[in-house]
Every structure is written in C-alpha cells, then in structure tokens.
Amino acid sequence: MEFILSLVGSLLLIICVLVSVAFLTLLERKVLGYIQIRKGPNKVGLMGIPQPFCDAIKLFTKEQTYPLLSNYLSYYISPIFSLFLSLFVWMCMPFFVKLYSFNLGGLFFLCCMSLGVYTVMVAGWSSNSNYALLGGLRAVAQTISYEVSLALIGFKILLFSLL
C-alpha cells in the first residue's frame, strides 16, 4: 500500500512539474510580448491560457525525422533519458508530504545533474555528424565547468551553515 501511495505521489509530482513548466513558458512568452509592445500568445481560448496544451498537441503530432546515418535508438533515447533525469531531481526536494526521504539528498541532486552531461554527449555522438559531436562536446565542457562552481558554492553554503 505504501508503494502505491508513493507511486501515485510521484506521478502527481511529475504532472504538476510538467504543467507548471508549461505555464511558466506561457508567462515568459507573455512578458516578452509586452516588452516588445504586443500582446503575446492570445489567440487560443481566453487570453491564451490553453496555449501550452495546444503547443503540446502540435509537438506530438509533428512528423518524426532523424538523420539517415544516425544510430536511431540512442538518437531518440538520450533526450528521453535527460527528461527522466531532470524529473528525478524533483524526487529529493522536501515537500509537505515526504515522498522519499534521502539522507544525502544534496549528493543525489549533484549526481542527477552530472549524469545529464552524458545524455548531451550521446545525443551528439549518435547523429554520426562531426559538427553535432563537436557541439555536444562543447556543451559537455560548459556543463562540467558550471557544475564544479555549483558544487563549490553548495559546499560553501553547507560549511557556513555548520559553523
């Protein structure tokens, strides 16, 4: 019974995160529209509120294309794996209802964030294009350098909170 409750809680958390990201994207588009002295997305429904759902339907109905010489399976699995890794990060966040209790939640956060680097590298490699591979390696180098500074800042905060 406890497993089912944690599974339902996890699914509810994932759905809430995805819907909130969709509406934050709508907010960003509205703000950018008002900055550029236009209304932003307002054609769908009342003031464009259902726009993220229409964008999702449009995205899922588009034709799937892939490079001819690419590794088909890893080309499509790496972005899906990256999405799952970013959703796993939300599992260690402390909420009012404890879904999972981690003693080392910060370490789990850093591990999930550092595993996302490999998905970018695999996505660049699996297209079998030298330019995509170089772009993926450049993104990996940038991400690793940002992760080092993020870890140092986190350890500094942890050190000062213990003093």
Swiss-Prot record:
Keyword Mitochondrion tagged: yes
Domain of life where this protein originates: Eukaryota
Biological process (GO), any one: aerobic respiration
Membrane-spanning parts: 3-23, 77-97, 104-124, 143-163
GO MF: NADH dehydrogenase (ubiquinone) activity
Catalytic activities: a ubiquinone + NADH + 5 H(+)(in) = a ubiquinol + NAD(+) + 4 H(+)(out)
InterPro entries associated with the record: NADH_UbQ_OxRdtase_su1/FPO (IPR001694), NADH_UbQ_OxRdtase_su1_CS (IPR018086)
Compartment(s): Mitochondrion inner membrane
Membrane topology (UniProt): Multi-pass membrane protein
EC number: 7.1.1.2
Pfam families: NADHdh
Keyword line: Electron transport, Membrane, Mitochondrion, Mitochondrion inner membrane, NAD, Respiratory chain, Translocase, Transmembrane, Transmembrane helix, Transport, Ubiquinone
This protein's GO CC annotations: mitochondrial inner membrane
Function summary: Core subunit of the mitochondrial membrane respiratory chain NADH dehydrogenase (Complex I) that is believed to belong to the minimal assembly required for catalysis. Complex I functions in the transfer of electrons from NADH to the respiratory chain. The immediate electron acceptor for the enzyme is believed to be ubiquinone.
PANTHER family, per the entry: NADH DEHYDROGENASE SUBUNIT 1, NADH-UBIQUINONE OXIDOREDUCTASE CHAIN 1
Family: Belongs to the complex I subunit 1 family.
Protein name in the entry: NADH-ubiquinone oxidoreductase chain 1
Source organism of this protein record: Drosophila affinis
